[in-house]
Amino acid sequence: MMEAVLSNADHPEYGVATIPLPIPRNQYDHCVALLEALEIGDASEADCRVDSLDSAWPVLNRLVSTKVNLDELDYLAKRLDSFTVGEFSQFQAMVEKLHLTSMKDLINLTFCCQQATVITDFTNLKEVGRDHYMNIHGGCASMEELEQLDGVETAVLLIEDNEGTITRYGVVYDNGMQLSQLYDGKHLPCYHYEADMTVVGISSRWEPENSRNVTWIYLPASKGQIERAMQRSGIADPKDMRLFMADSSFPEEVDVALDFRCDNIYELNELALVADTSPLGLRIDSKRRKKLMAKRLALGHKADDHEEQGWQNGPSM
């Protein structure tokens, strides 16, 4: 966990807001309200000045005194929260090597830093060689490959044949890594952090159906989260929204029956909330099953109504 102290750079007299990172789902709207009171926290703009950042990631101190976007900062914190000890070194060393400072670059680095090799202990070359072999093979290797691998020789060849970069986090070899461009600076890539019932992508229905300009919403979500996702996609009217289903953890009986051509993100969110709050998780009791199926029928009827009206450009899921 991290903790960021954010302020309005234009009006420091407004005070500060302390935001936990990653933001717990049930605190998201409250955190947004704290920032709105300072006249910051825009859904798309980087308008939050970082006064301080308390985290286990020293390299992130470069964000202090810069302006960031709340959702980008939250997304980065979620990505880093899942990192292993090895990735901890890889990310920080590559940030320093590449002199990265923008949130876009930092987020993109989380998707590719695993390709780099960082040596923090030169006394165990066997382990260094083994780690390097895994890094350049996408983190995958069979037991037979690893048993036959000469870790010491692999490490020596790496050190002798390549120029490493000395950082505060170890000597890093990029192994030809190219900075990922998965994040375009507006549409955060789909990433499961918490257990969710379903993930829905939204885009303007004026976008091509195969458009990659998709903003992801993890249901159930608060009304504020849905509205901010719409703002990030430039959608002012829910009627102009196209929905895409990424995956689902709905109970099988609902997942199979549900017509995902629903055009109402709020009703789909209600369905996810009913399923998520069932006493036995995905094992729905009879009372809640009736509520789920009632929701399903309501959503399905609305989708059928659109078809009868000859609606051609509606949501596809």
Language model features: what each stretch is:
Residues 68, 162-166, 303:
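Mixed-charge, low-complexity intrinsically disordered regions
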Residues 1-44, 196-235:
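N-terminal ordered "arm"
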Residues 94-128:
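Phosphate/anion-contacting hairpin/loop surfaces
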Residues 28-102, 224-289:
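Structured domain cores in non-transmembrane regions
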Residues 39, 80, 87, 98, ...:
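Short, flexible helical or helix-coil boundary motifs
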Residues 150, 290-301, 306-317:
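Non-Sec secretion/translocation targeting segments of pathogen effectors
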Residues 11-16, 56-59, 179-181, 207-213, ...:
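Short, surface-exposed beta-strand/loop "edge" segments at domain boundaries and coil↔beta transitions
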Residues 122-199, 206-214:
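Extended, well-ordered protein cores
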